[in-house]
A protein has these predicted regions:
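Nucleotide/phosphate-binding catalytic cleft detector across ATP-hydrolyzing
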Residues: 97-135, 141, 145-150, 197-324, ...
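Acidic low-complexity intrinsically disordered segments
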Residues: 113, 121, 292, 426-462, ...
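A short acidic Gly-Thr/Ser loop motif
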Residues: 131-137, 300, 319-335, 340-343, ...
C-alpha cells in the first residue's frame, strides 16, 4: 500500500524483493541524507546560535566597556570638575589670604611710614643751595622746591643741579663794591687794567683760623693788584658771596621761578680745621650777602653725604656696616672724616671727629712760583706783578694747570713750558740759557721757562708726602677696625700724581665722580637732611665753670675763699672728648648762686682737648662763649634759687640758661667743633 508519500509498507515476515531492496536502499539513502541534512542543520543552528551568543556576549561586553568608558569619562570629568573646583576655591582662598596680608602689610607700612617718614621722604618748602667757597675756585649746586614738595630721599641727588663751570675765588672791587667776581674778574685781569680797580685773589687763604680773633670786624687783607691795598676781610667775603648768590638766583629764576634770597635755604661749607671765629665770620658775611636762612657745614662732612649716591663707587662699599674714610683734598686744606654706614638709607655714624691740616695744593703753586723767581730773580717777579699784572695773573693760571695736569708717565719727558710774554719785560735773554736753582737746572729763553717734568713731580711729591703721613696716622689710630674704602674728593683729587701716590699706599682708594663739585652737592643734601649724620664724635670736652672745694692732690692756680672755704673754678663736664653726640641730644644740670646776695650767675662755656679736665685754668681750656643770667630773688635762700643749664647737641651746640623761679631763659649758640 502506498502512502501519500509513495512509500510501501512491507510485511515484516515477507522476504524482500530486489525492487524492495532497491527501494529500501534508496529510502535508506534518502533517510540518511535527510538525517545528514538534519544533523548538518542542527550543527549549523548550534554554530550560528553559539556565534550569535558569542557576538551578543561580545556586544554586551563591548557595550558595557563603552558604557564604563563613558561613565568613567563622565566621572573623570566630574572628578576633574570637583578637583578644579577645589583648586579654584583653594586658589581663591589663598588669593584672599594674600590680599588680606598685603592690606595688613600696606596698613602696617603706612603706619610705619607715618612714624618714620623722614627715612623715605623729605618735605621741603624752600629751594636749597649749597655753596663751596674754595681757595682757588668756588661753585654752587641747588635743588628747587616750592609749595611743600615731597621727594624720595633716594632721588635727591638725581634732582640736584649745578653750574656748568666753577668760579675762580677772586673779585674786583671798585668804590668799596663788587665790580666783577669769579671767572670774569680773573679774565679781565689777564689784560692791562686801571689801578682804580682793586683785585683780590684766593680770598679764603686769608682766613687763617690761628690769626682770627673774636672780633673780626677790624681784620684787613691786602690786594693782589694794585699791590698791598688794604680792605676789610668781611667786606671782600660778603661781596664775593653776594656775586655768587646773585648768579645762582638768576639761574634758578630762569627756570620759571620768581624767588628772592629769602626764599632759599643756603648752606656754605668751611674747612674742618676752622675754629669758631672763622665759622662765625663766614656766617656773618653770608647774612650780609642776603643769605638769611644760612647753615654752615664742614667740607668733609658734606662730601661724605654724597658718597652713598655716587655711581662711580661700587655698591659693595655702600652696604650697612661698611666703613669709609673721606679725604677732601682742596687748595687750602686737607680735611678728613671717618664714617660708618648704619642703614640702607645711607645714614652715617661718625667714628672720628673731622680733622685736617693746611697741606692743601696751594703750597705747590707757591713752590713753582718760587722756582720761577729763582730763574728770573725776585726783583723781576715783583716788577712783573707791579707793572704787568696781566702777565703775572696769566702766570698763576698756568701754574694751576701744571699742578693738576702733571702725571707720573715716565714715557713722557716733555718739559712744562711757562710763557711769560717777553714783550712786556726786558729781563730775558734772546737765546736759551740755563739757570741753576734749588730745584735743579732750568732752561729759559726770551719768551718761555722750560721746567723738566721730574722737577714738577718732585715738588708735588714733596707736598703730597705730609698728606699720606696724615692718612697713615689715622689708619694707625684705628688699626682695630677695617676701613673698607678711602674716598677722595675736592679739586686737588684730580691730580694724577696724588691719585697714584694714595693708591700706592691705600689700594682701596677711589676718587668720587666729579670730585671738584662733590662738596657743593653734598652741601645741598646737608641742607635737606641735616640729620643724615646720626651721630658725631665730640672733638673736645665741653662744659661750664662752677665752684667747688679744691680737689685733693690737685691744686688750682687761682683759688678763692668763699664762706671761709678755699674753692676753685672747676670744669663741670657736659660731654667728654670722643663721646658720641646724637642729633637733638639734651643734657641738663642745675646750679645755685655762690653767695646769698648774688643777683646773677655768669656762665662761661668751655672746651678742652683733655678727656677729663679738672679746672678751667688748665692750659688747653678755651672759652667758647658766655651768658649772664639774672637771679634777683634774693629774698629766697641760696639753695632755693636754682638755675638750669641745658645743652642741645647736634651739628652745633645750643646752650641755654634758665632761672627756674622766674622762668626767664637766655640762649648762647656756639659751634664748637674742632676749636684750635
Amino acid at each position: 500500500m502506498e502512502s501519500g508519500n509513495n512509500k510501501k509498507i512491507l510485511n515484516e515476515n515477507s522476504a524482500p524483493s530486489i525492487s524492495d531492496l532497491k527501494y529500501k536502499t534508496q529510502e535508506k539513502i534518502t533517510n540518511n541524507n535527510e538525517n545528514n541534512d538534519n544533523r548538518l542543520n542542527k550543527k549549523n543552528l548550534i554554530f550560528y546560535s553559539i556565534l550569535i551568543l558569542i557576538l551578543s556576549l561580545l556586544s554586551f561586553l563591548l557595550y558595557n566597556f563603552i558604557l564604563r568608558l563613558i561613565t568613567q569619562n563622565n566621572n573623570d570629568k566630574n572628578d576633574l570638575g570637583i578637583e578644579e573646583g577645589k583648586k579654584k576655591r583653594k586658589y581663591e582662598e589663598e588669593l584672599e589670604k594674600i590680599k588680606k596680608e598685603l592690606e595688613e602689610e600696606k596698613k602696617k607700612r603706612k603706619e610705619e611710614f607715618e612714624i618714620n617718614k623722614n627715612k623715605y621722604y623729605k618735605e621741603i618748602n624752600k629751594t636749597v643751595v649749597g655753596i663751596d667757597f674754595g681757595s682757588s675756585k668756588s661753585g654752587f649746586a641747588f635743588i628747587i622746591f616750592e609749595n611743600n614738595n615731597k621727594i624720595l630721599i633716594d632721588e635727591i641727588t638725581k634732582e640736584i643741579e649745578f653750574k656748568d663751570y666753577i668760579e675762580k675765588s677772586c673779585i674786583i672791587m671798585k668804590d668799596n663794591k663788587m665790580f666783577e667776581y669769579g671767572n670774569k674778574a680773573n679774565k679781565r685781569m689777564n689784560k692791562p687794567i686801571s689801578k682804580e680797580y682793586i683785585y683780590f685773589d684766593r680770598i679764603k687763604t686769608n682766613l687763617d683760623p690761628k690769626k682770627l680773633e673774636k672780633d673780626s670786624s677790624n681784620i684787613k687783607i691786602k690786594s693782589s693788584f694794585p699791590d698791598n691795598v688794604e680792605m676789610p676781610l668781611k667786606l671782600i667775603i660778603q661781596e664775593y658771596l653776594k656775586g655768587i648768590t646773585d648768579d645762582c638766583l638768576e639761574i634758578i629764576n630762569k627756570k620759571g621761578h620768581n624767588f628772592t634770597k629769602k626764599d632759599i635755604n643756603w648752606v656754605v661749607t668751611v674747612p674742618a680745621i676752622w675754629n669758631e671765629y672763622g665759622k662765625e665770620l663766614m656766617k656773618e658775611c653770608a647774612i650780609q650777602a642776603g643769605m638769611e636762612n644760612i647753615k654752615i657745614a664742614l667740607e668733609p662732612e658734606a662730601a661724605s653725604l654724597l658718597l652713598f649716591d655716587d655711581t662711580s663707587i661700587d655698591k659693595k662699599y655702600k652696604e650697612k656696616g661698611k666703613i669709609f674714610m673721606l679725604v677732601d683734598a682742596g687748595g687750602y686744606t686737607i680735611d678728613i672724616t671717618l664714617n660708618e654706614i648704619v642703614d640702607e638709607q645711607g645714614n652715617l655714624k661718625q667714628l672720628s671727629p673731622p680733622s685736617g691740616n693746611s697741606f692743601g695744593s696751594m703750597k705747590i703753586n707757591k713752590d713753582i712760583l718760587n722756582l720761577i723767581q729763582q730763574v728770573i730773580s725776585e726783583k723781576s717777579l715783583k716788577d712783573i706783578k707791579k707793572d704787568s699784572f696781566d702777565v703775572y695773573n696769566n702766570l698763576l693760571n698756568q701754574i694751576e694747570e701744571i699742578k693738576i695736569d702733571a702725571n707720573d708717565d715716565d714715557s713722557d719727558n716733555k718739559d712744562f713750558i711757562i710763557n711769560l710774554n717777553s714783550n712786556s719785560c726786558g729781563w730775558f735773554s734772546s737765546s736759551k740759557c740755563i739757570k741753576r736753582t734749588d730745584f735743579g737746572e732750568i732752561t729759559y729763553d726770551n719768551n718761555n721757562i722750560y721746567i723738566p717734568k721730574q722737577v714738577i713731580k718732585n715738588l708735588i711729591l714733596k707736598r703730597i708726602s705730609p698728606i699720606i703721613d696724615h692718612i697713615k696716622e689715622i689708619y694707625k689710630t684705628f688699626n682695630d677696625i677695617n676701613i673698607d674704602l678711602l674716598a677722595i674728593a675736592g679739586g686737588f683729587s684730580n691730580s694724577n700724581i696724588l691719585k697714584k701716590e694714595i693708591r700706592k699706599y691705600f689700594p682701596n682708594a677711589k676718587v668720587l665722580k666729579n670730585p671738584q663739585i662733590s662738596v657743593m652737592k653734598g652741601a645741598v643734601i646737608y641742607g635737606i637732611i641735616p640729620n643724615k649724620i646720626i651721630s658725631r664724635k665730640s672733638p673736645k670736652t665741653i662744659g661750664v665753670s662752677s665752684y667747688s672745694l679744691q680737689r685733693p692732690g690737685k691744686e688750682c692756680k687761682d683759688p678763692e675763699i668763699v664762706d671761709g672755704e678755699m674753692k676753685c673754678r672747676y670744669f663741670d663736664i657736659f660731654k667728654r672728648k670722643g663721646e658720641d653726640i646724637f642729633n637733638n641730644e639734651i643734657i641738663e644740670k642745675t646750679y645755685t648762686p655762690l653767695k646769698e646776695d648774688q643777683k646773677d650767675i655768669f656762665f662761661i662755656l668751655y672746651s678742652s682737648n683733655s678727656y677729663n679736665p679738672t679746672y678751667i685754668d688748665e692750659e688747653d681750656v678755651k672759652i667758647l662763649g658766655s651768658f649772664d643770667l639774672e637771679m634777683n630773688e634774693t629774698n629766697l635762700k641760696r639753695e632755693e634759687r636754682k638755675a638750669l643749664v641745658r645743652m642741645e647737641f647736634g651739628a652745633n651746640i645750643n646752650a641755654y640758661a634758665k632761672n627756674k623761679i622766674s622762668g626767664k631763659e637766655i640762649k648762647l649758640k656756639a659751634n664748637y667743633y674742632n676749636q684750635n
